[in-house]
C-alpha cells in the first residue's frame, strides 16, 4: 500500500521524486521521504504526514541536489508512523539507501541475525533488514549484493536501492509487489504505479516477480532471478497526466463520480458489435462450468454481490460470492468445473491474488476483471476483461465499482446467450437496456439536485442504516461502505427482511434509514420494512424509480433514479448514494480523496 519512485538522469532528482510521490498520494500514506546520491554520501529527507511537508522541508527539492534518487510514501505495517520509521532507510556505513513496498515475513529472524553480527537498527520496520543485508553482502558488486540479499527475503517486496559507489545507478527489484520502469531519453524512472510516470514518459516496462532492473541515465537492463540479462519490450501508456487531474472539481472523487457515464460507455461500446456481445479472448466452454465463484475485497466484492444476481438469473448456473481474505484460508469445493471471477480495480490486491492462486491450484479457471493493464491479476488469470475506467485517484472507488459491475452484466448476457438460457427478443431487450446504462447513469446524476440539501440534513447523524432486498441489498452494501469510509459516520447495511431479527432494536427517534426500493419484485416487502422503522421513529430516505408514488407517500425524503430493468439497475442506483456520501463528507469537513487509515491499493495482506 506504500508507493515508491526512482529516478536517474541529468536534472535534479528531488523535484522529480516529489512529483512522482504526489501522483501516488491516492494509494494512502502516513509519511514520506526521499534519498538523493551526492557524491560519496546519500542525503535523506523524510517527514511524518503529507508530501507537502516534505516539499516545505526540502524547499521543493532545492535543498537536496543530485541527479539520482529514490522516494517513498509509507502506510505503516511494522512500526508507528513517525520520521524514524519513514523510508528511505540507510545502511550503517551510509553507502546504501532503500525504499520498499510490501512485507518481509521473516524480518525478525533476519533482524536477530544482523544484530548478532553488529548491525545497528534505527527503526522498528521490516524494511531496515534489507539495507543491512545489502551492506553485509556487498563486496564491490552492487547488483550481486542485492540479489544475495533478495534471496534471503520471504514475503512481498518492490525495492528501489541507490549506492554511493555507483552514483548514477538505481536498482529496482520485484517480488509479489507491482513495479514499473519508465523509459526516457537521457533519464529513466521506476514507480509502483504508472500514474507517477506519465508526466515524464509514456513508455514503460512491467517487471515480473524475481526480476531486477539496473537503471542509468542512458540504459535499462533487466535480469532474471539467476542474474542473467533478459530483453523486455516497452509498452505504451495511452492516457496522459491530464486524465489524473481534478478537472475543475473540488475533489477527485466528485470528478470520478461525474465521469461514470463516460467510463461505463467506454467499457460497453467496444464489446457490442452487430447486435452481439463480443468478449475477445474469452475462450471458455461454458457448458462445462457447473458453478461460478466471485471473489474480491471491499467495493469490488460488493460489485460481485450485485453481479451475482444477474449472472445466476440469466445463466441458471449457481453463483456464490466470497471475500478473498476469507476464501484464501478456506477449503473451498472448487474443481475444474468451477469458473472463478476475480474483481480488483488495481489488479494488485494481495488477498485476492492469494485466493486466486489457491483456486487455480484446485483446478478452477480464473476470469479477471481489472482496470490496470499489466497488473499481477491480469497476468496470472486464465482470461482477462478490462474495465477501461481510466485512472481512479480518490481512495474511495466510484467508477471502478460501476465499471466492474458493467463487465459482470456484459459477461452475464454473453454467457446466457452462449448457453441458450436467454435468446431472441429477451436478449435484444436486455442488450438495449445495457446500451442505455450510460445515459441512465447521467440521468441519475442530473435528476437529484437536492442531494447537497439532504446531506446538510443528515450529516450530523451518529449512525445510519442502509436496507434493501435482493439487488437492492447489494447496492445497500456499497452505499453504506461509501458513507462510512469518507464521512466517518457509522453506516451499516442489512437485508431488509433481517431487521426483525435483532437490528430493529437499534432504531431510535430520528435514526436515518436509507431504503433501496428499485426492485419491483420485492418492493412491497421493503415497503413493510419502511413502515416498521418509521413506527419506531426512523427518518427514511428512500431511493426509488421516478414516479413511484407508493414510496413517496411513505418516505420522509426521496432520491430518484430512472426506470431500468432490475437486473441492471444497480449501476445507476448506486450513483446518488455516492453523491450523498460525498456531500455528507464535505459537510463534515473530511479529507474526501484520502480518508484516514485507508489506502487505495491494498497490496499487503
Residue spans for each PLM region:
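Conserved short alpha-helical segments that host acidic/polar catalytic motifs at enzyme active sites
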Residues: 1-251, 259-270, 274-288, 302, ...
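Glycine-rich oxoanion-binding loops at beta->alpha junctions
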Residues: 67, 71-84, 267-284, 307-343, ...
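Generic C-terminus detector
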Residues: 227, 539, 554, 564-605
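Glycine-rich phosphate-binding loops that contact phosphosugars or nucleotide phosphates
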Residues: 288-436, 516-560, 580, 588
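Acidic/histidine-rich
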Residues: 156-187, 459-485, 520-522, 527
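Active-site phosphate/pyrophosphate-binding segments
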Residues: 260-264, 268-293, 383-512, 585-605
Amino acid at each position: 500500500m506504500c508507493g515508491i519512485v526512482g529516478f536517474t538522469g541529468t536534472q535534479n532528482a528531488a523535484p522529480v521524486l516529489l512529483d512522482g510521490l504526489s501522483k501516488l498520494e491516492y494509494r494512502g500514506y502516513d509519511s514520506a521521504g526521499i534519498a538523493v546520491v551526492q557524491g560519496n554520501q546519500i542525503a535523506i529527507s523524510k517527514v511524518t504526514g503529507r508530501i507537502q511537508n516534505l516539499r516545505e522541508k526540502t524547499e521543493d527539492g532545492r535543498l537536496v541536489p543530485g541527479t539520482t534518487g529514490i522516494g517513498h510514501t509509507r502506510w505503516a505495517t511494522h512500526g508507528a508512523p513517525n520520521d524514524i520509521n519513514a523510508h528511505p532507510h540507510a545502511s550503517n556505513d551510509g553507502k546504501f539507501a532503500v525504499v520498499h513496498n510490501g512485507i518481509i515475513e521473516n524480518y525478525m529472524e533476519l533482524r536477530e541475525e544482523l544484530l548478532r553480527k553488529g548491525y545497528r537498527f534505527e527503526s522498528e520496520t521490516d524494511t531496515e533488514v534489507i539495507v543491512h543485508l545489502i551492506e553485509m553482502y556487498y563486496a564491490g558488486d552492487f547488483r550481486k549484493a542485492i540479489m544475495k540479499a533478495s534471496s534471503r527475503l520471504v514475503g512481498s517486496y518492490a525495492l528501489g536501492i541507490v549506492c554511493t559507489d555507483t552514483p548514477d545507478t538505481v536498482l529496482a527489484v520485484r517480488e509479489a509487489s507491482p513495479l514499473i520502469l519508465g523509459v526516457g531519453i537521457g533519464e529513466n524512472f521506476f514507480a509502483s504505479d504508472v500514474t507517477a510516470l506519465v508526466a515524464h514518459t509514456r513508455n514503460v516496462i512491467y517487471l515480473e516477480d524475481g526480476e531486477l532492473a539496473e537503471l542509468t541515465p542512458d540504459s535499462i537492463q533487466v535480469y532474471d532471478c539467476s542474474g542473467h540479462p533478459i530483453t523486455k519490450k516497452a509498452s505504451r501508456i495511452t492516457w496522459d497526466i491530464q486524465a489524473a487531474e481534478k478537472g475543475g472539481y473540488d475533489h477527485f472523487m466528485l470528478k470520478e463520480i461525474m465521469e461514470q457515464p463516460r467510463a461505463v460507455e467506454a467499457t460497453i461500446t467496444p464489446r457490442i458489435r452487430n447486435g452481439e456481445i463480443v468478449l475477445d479472448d474469452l475462450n471458455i466452454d461454458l457448458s462445462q462450468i457447473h458453478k461460478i465463484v466471485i471473489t474480491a475485497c471491499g467495493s469490488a466484492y460488493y460489485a460481485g454481490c450485485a453481479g451475482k444476481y444477474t449472472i445466476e438469473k440469466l445463466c441458471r448456473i449457481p453463483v456464490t460470492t466470497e471475500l478473498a481474505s476469507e476464501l484464501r484460508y478456506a477449503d473451498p469445493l472448487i474443481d475444474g468445473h468451477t469458473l472463478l471471477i476475480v474483481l480488483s480495480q488495481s489488479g494488485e490486491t494481495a488477498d485476492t491474488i492469494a485466493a486466486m492462486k489457491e483456486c487455480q491450484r484446485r483446478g478452477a479457471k480464473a476470469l479477471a476483471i481489472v482496470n490496470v493493464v499489466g497488473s499481477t491479476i491480469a497476468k496470472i488469470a486464465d482470461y482477462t476483461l478490462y474495465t477501461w475506467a481510466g485512472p481512479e485517484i480518490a481512495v474511495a472507488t466510484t467508477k471502478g465499482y460501476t465499471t466492474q459491475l458493467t463487465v459482470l452484466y456484459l459477461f452475464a448476457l454473453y454467457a446466457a446467450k452462449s448457453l441458450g438460457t436467454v435468446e431472441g427478443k429477451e436478449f435484444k431487450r436486455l442488450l438495449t437496456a445495457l446500451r442505455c446504462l450510460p445515459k441512465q447513469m447521467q440521468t441519475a446524476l442530473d435528476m437529484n439536485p437536492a442531494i447537497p440539501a439532504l446531506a446538510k440534513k443528515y450529516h450530523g447523524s451518529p449512525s445510519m442504516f442502509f436496507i434493501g432486498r435482493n439487488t437492492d441489498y447489494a447496492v445497500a452494501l456499497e452505499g453504506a461502505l461509501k458513507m462510512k469510509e469518507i464521512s466517518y459516520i457509522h453506516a451499516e447495511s442489512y437485508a431488509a427482511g433481517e431487521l426483525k431479527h435483532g437490528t430493529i432494536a437499534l432504531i431510535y427517534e430520528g435514526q436515518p434509514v436509507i431504503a433501496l426500493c428499485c426492485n419491483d419484485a420485492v418492493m412491497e416487502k421493503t415497503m413493510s420494512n419502511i413502515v416498521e422503522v418509521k413506527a419506531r421513529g426512523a427518518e427514511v430516505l428512500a431511493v426509488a424509480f421516478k414516479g413511484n408514488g407508493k414510496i413517496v407517500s411513505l418516505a420522509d425524503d426521496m432520491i430518484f433514479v430512472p426506470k431500468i430493468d432490475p437486473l441492471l439497475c444497480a449501476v445507476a442506483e448506486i450513483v446518488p448514494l455516492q453523491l450523498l456520501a460525498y456531500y455528507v463528507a464535505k459537510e463534515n469537513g473530511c479529507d474526501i480523496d484520502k480518508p484516514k487509515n485507508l489506502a487505495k491499493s491494498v497490496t499487503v495482506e
